[in-house]
Amino acid sequence: MKAKETYLSRDFRETAAQRFPAQAKQLNAAFDMRLNALLAENAGASKEKQYHLKRQILPGIAAYETLQRVMPKEEALQTVHGYVEHLAR
């Protein structure tokens, strides 16, 4: 089940390319694997809940968990928070 590209996944890929170019391919693959696993785990959710899970919640979790491979937890959290803040402006 391939997820539609969201602002979170787009911003994650941009961060990976700009800040971790040598690891970007592996980070993108790890992000995609984690996101697909999260989507599969939540496949039974209601249609209304699915929308929010697919567009924001699960991509945010996947980005946060994947970024922790290359940065401290707090920095990963602030990075993902920055994606949301940027969209809100």
Feature roles, as predicted:
Residues M1-K2:
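Small-residue-biased structural context
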Residues E5-G44:
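N-terminal acidic leader/helix
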Residues T15, R19, E48-R55:
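A structural signal for alpha-helical segments
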Residues K25, A29-D32, N36, K54, ...:
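Generic structural signal for well-ordered, non-transmembrane alpha-helical segments
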Residues R34, E41, A45-E48, L67-V70, ...:
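Hydrophobic stripe of amphipathic alpha-helices that form coiled-coil interfaces
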Residues Y51-G82:
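Short, charge-rich amphipathic interface segments used for partner binding and complex assembly
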Residues G82-R89:
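Long, amphipathic, charge-rich alpha-helical segments that form helical bundles/coiled-coils
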